[in-house]
């Protein structure tokens, strides 16, 4: 029976990976990772050059990604079957298997769906990782929250009206799953009066990183690894007498 270790890989730059994750990956005899059919897989690319020459790789290829709406019954059936099958395969493997997961495994990570299926069937360890959004707001060079700011994490797949409601009720916000949903996100930000303060970070901490004001972006689409940010402006200690400040 296998022992499953899921390692969070952080936002993309291998140097931002946890020391424990780095050590486990380099020592792994078996790894597993998610990928879209025909693609190398972002998680696999992050660990390029770190793996033992004899490592056995298990590529878990999604049966569907953006071909069907995420709320489609067919989408749910396909993904549920996919996770069921891979949970069974991982349990049946001998020895230790290191599962790679971008960001943090317990923060919107695909591994969560395996985790719930593996509990009680096999020994599991999860190694935390820096989230992708953390890397992105550091790329802007600005703190994301101050004082009592309320931070909302939204999905670009939500309806425009839902996005507007949440955007108007928080101080700082992060929008994930942008990609082809960017036009909807942009309209929602404009309706909420927050477009002027929004940033688009593409490929945060990775090669090809690009940071731009969303209002200045002409394209209707963006890469999968892109996040929209609006920074909070909350309570902070201010210098009472600026003229004598050091």
Positions of the model-derived regions?
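Conserved beta-strand scaffold positions in the cores of enzyme catalytic domains, especially
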Residues: 4, 57-59, 124-126, 153, ...
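Short internal beta-strands
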Residues: 27-37, 126-128, 197-202
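Residues at the C-termini of beta-strands that transition into short coil/loop
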Residues: 35, 61-63, 128-130, 155-157, ...
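Short gly/pro/ser/thr-enriched loop/turn and capping motifs at secondary-structure boundaries
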Residues: 38-40, 65-66, 131-134, 182-183, ...
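Class I SAM-dependent methyltransferase SAM-binding "motif I" and its flanking Rossmann-like core
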Residues: 103-169, 219, 232-236
């Amino acid at each position: 029976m296998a022992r499953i270790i899921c390692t969070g890989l952080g936002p993309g730059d291998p140097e931002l990976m946890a020391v424990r994750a780095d050590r486990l990956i380099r020592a792994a005899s078996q790894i597993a990772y998610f990928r879209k059919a025909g693609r190398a897989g972002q998680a696999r690319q992050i660990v390029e050059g770190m793996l033992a020459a004899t490592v056995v790789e298990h590529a878990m290829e999604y049966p569907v990604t953006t071909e069907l709406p995420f709320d489609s019954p067919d989408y749910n059936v396909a993904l549920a079957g996919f996770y069921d099958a891979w949970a069974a395969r991982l349990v049946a493997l001998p020895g230790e298997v290191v599962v790679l997961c971008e960001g943090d495994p317990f923060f919107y990570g695909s591994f969560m769906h395996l985790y719930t299926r593996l509990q009680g069937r096999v020994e599991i360890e999860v190694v935390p990782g820096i989230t992708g959004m953390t890397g992105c707001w550091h790329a802007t060079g600005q703190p994301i929250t101050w004082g009592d700011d309320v931070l909302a994490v939204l999905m670009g797949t939500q309806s425009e009206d839902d996005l507007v409601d949440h955007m108007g009720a928080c101080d700082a916000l992060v929008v994930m799953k942008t990609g082809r949903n960017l036009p909807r996100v942009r309209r929602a930000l404009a309706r909420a009066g927050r477009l002027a303060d929004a940033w688009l970070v593409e490929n945060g901490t990775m090669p090809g990183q690009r940071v731009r004001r969303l209002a200045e972006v002409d394209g209707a689409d963006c890469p999968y690894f892109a996040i929209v940010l609006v920074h909070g402006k909350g309570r902070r200690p201010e210098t009472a007498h600026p003229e004598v400040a050091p």
